Curated annotation (Swiss-Prot):
The protein's name in its UniProt record: UDP-N-acetylmuramate--L-alanine ligase
Primary location: cytoplasm
Similarity comment: family membership: Belongs to the MurCDEF family.
Catalysed reactions, semicolon-separated: UDP-N-acetyl-alpha-D-muramate + L-alanine + ATP = UDP-N-acetyl-alpha-D-muramoyl-L-alanine + ADP + phosphate + H(+)
InterPro entries: Mur-like_cat_sf, Mur_ligase_C, Mur_ligase_C_dom_sf, Mur_ligase_cen, Mur_ligase_N, MurCDEF_pg_biosynth, UDP-N-AcMur_Ala_ligase_MurC
Cysteine disulfide links: none
Gene symbol of the encoding locus: murC
Subcellular localization: Cytoplasm
Described function: Cell wall formation.
Amino acid sequence: MQLDKKIINHVHCLGIGGIGVSALAEILLKKGCRVTGSDVSPNKNTERLQRLGAEIIFNHDGTAITQADCAVYSSAIGATNPELMAAKQAKIPLLKRGEMLANLMKEYQSIAVAGAHGKTTTSGMLSHAFVEANLDPTFMVGGVLNNSQTPARVGNGHYFIAEADESDASFLFMHPDIAVVTNIDADHLSTYDGDFNRLKQTYIQFLEQTAQDGVVVLCLDDPILREIAPLLSRRVITYGFSSDAQYRVVDYCQQGIQSLFQIHSPQRKAPLTVKLSMPGQHNALNATAVTAIADVVQMNEPALLKSLADFPGVDRRFTIRGEMILPKGNALIIEDYGHHPNEIKATLAAARAAWPERRMVLVFQPHRYSRTRDLMTEFVSVLAETDWLVLLEVYSAGEMPIPGADGMALIKMMSNGMAQKTTFVPLLQNLPETLQKLSQPNDIIILQGAGNIGSIVTALVQTHG
């Protein structure tokens, strides 16, 4: 559907408390639209939007939608949702979240960041760089930036930076001027009928929708992207640790939770020395993608380097929450949103490099029964890399339980040695008591997952710390 700004004054957002829809609602509000919305319960996102003027009700009975010019919904909204059904009955135009986003991006020079892992941090880092360089961008990312405490911004500049979502294939609504893909992995396969090749072909279609004179930026360390790169008709810029990448990371080292490295590129005679206030080789890759894009738009180099050095990160991405007080010392609490085996692996590697002598306690809440089923072997392998595992029950994210894909099924797949250093906690509210009993002074406790595991942070840090 084509968005006609002349007649769209009132937008209703279903599931307005979700990070993606809330970010879109914030942009619409700041562009002068009347925004109404609904969700099942209030959260930080709805509170932020209400302060900006959004009118929100906390039910889905279908009564709030009938006066809107159009309605926006995400893939989390099911076909039987009363508001969705009411909108159809009232013949109110319905747009998917990604469709509305793509319509808004048409007004700008657009940059879309896609990938299975790292797209939120990369798009957030890129947005921060554009702000620091006084390019006054509009942006919409999939997480709350720690410095601005918002996932969205409306600027007066020419650029719109957005996270592109492959989980529901809605990135196909986009036709960006610059497209970035950080990696491709076997996730959200239910959208693609379980066919990884179809997922790969959809990425190719997305990249080929980049403007004819546009640029595609790909991580050459990813074997699928390496395979795809020569197939594309657009100009391709590559980055990575790989020796044949155009933007190449060299001399990477981690000092505590900071990263230092150099970037060799065809744009420069001398390597670019980069410092990040965040750990992990994956973040060095994210910063290198940002550097490649900065060169495309001819960003001021000192502004770029400053922005990379002072980028404070995105909420729930290796976020240090505080300390839990124990009888004989403290344990450090870190929260990370990663919910795929490769993301967990990157988090553990960064934590090990930062605190090599300290015991790692991983508290993992699996996200979706389908993902747990599809990646069971990979989860078992990566979870074995921690010193002690506290396993929570699967966060369903609206899915019905799948036999053999719950927390106990994961434990049954583990080796005897790993099972002996695993504690299963079926109820999240019992986690603080469990951690008090098993934690040791100087432990690093990582709360890992995309579900509601973060809701327990306050209890851990304030009640026990």
